[in-house]
Amino acid sequence: LAGIFGWHPVVVRLPVLVGGFLYLWAAIHLTRKMSEQTWVRLFALVMLLGNPYLLEFFSLARGYGLAAGLMLAALWQSWCFLEKNQSGHLRSAIIFAGLAVYANFTLLLFFAPFILLVLIAAWQLNPSFSNFWKKSRPALLTLLVFVALLFEPLRQLRKDPEIQGWNKLGSFFGSMEQSVKAAIQINAYLGDNTVEILTWLAVLFSVGFTAVALWRWWQQGRRFDADPRLFLVAILPAAMITNMLQVHLTGTPYLQSRLALFYWPLFGLQLGVAAAWFWQAKGKLAWVYMAVLLSFTVLNISRCVNLTKSSEWWFDQGTYQVLDFLKKTYETEGRSEPIGLDAHHVMLNSFMFHLERDPRGFDKYVKMAPWHGFQPPGRDYEFFYAINPEEAKDIMDAYDVVLPVPGTSFILLRKKR
């Protein structure tokens, strides 16, 4: 798309917008199937859509949001297969799951257990080899294609030192704490130990509810098609176990919050299915459970509402304002050479992308310093973009603040003349 239409901000976000529509489409279908009760359906939908951290990724030009949408679409197609036993739905489920991995390779942790469980379900529906092969052949051939396509990228990834060294998260609980911290934006709802308390509550709920689902699965003849909700519940613990095995076997660290993003939809499905089973067993008493979670979700999303920046890419908030300011400076001063700009190292990638790719031609007005890691602010460029005044204090004798970015601590400095 970028090759045809250029690297316009809307164009580079089209895949993730598709992911957002897929996510919403699949979420609506899955929640309608979970329960006959309207309020339970609405509750389940809010659990899938009410995480502000997850929602951010449907506006960022990254693969995480697209992967989440494809994953939920795969789960919806697997539900359809469990209900109808049609080979087309099984093949579609594997296609969506395979594409989810291509959007974000972390979803291999979803893909592997999903394929295993959906093929077990296919065998349960078609317990003779001839019937199983007839129903599963298109899906299995599709699976082989994806395995072949994924082999070389995975081989290359194994050579990347970041796979071994990035984040250094040494425990699964630590990984979950990072995810919870990202989801609540460090709001101390329960005091200083909010993150730890909420993480324990989430872990205990998921473990306990998985045990309940396992009991129900056993009572219903160990068949997923007896209640497709069992399949939805099983995916989260299966993915977590896969993650633990991967860490143990490969020595890689546990997942940082954005890499673990795909856990949130799976957790949301567990919360929704729990409400459906609770209502089924106890009727309106389920409102106690739903009211608490709905209240917290509404409170959290209202506290974390975010229309101006990304919590993951917080340093990108003022990029366009700085570029527009420098463009205006170039034009009003009648310059013929691009303006020299240096910046804190975390901001460099965003500027370099816009200068190299943005079709609006900012490279005519601005020349960026070569990429560098963390280093003290230098005096080599006419303009310096700092994260805060504290960072720039050692060069303030030679620079003036010409643009404080509203709503942030970022400042653009210019050499005194």
Q: Where are the regions that the model predicts?
A:
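Membrane-proximal helix-loop-helix interfaces that form the catalytic/acceptor-binding platform
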Residues: 1-392, 398-413
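Short, solvent-exposed mixed-charge patches
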Residues: 416-417
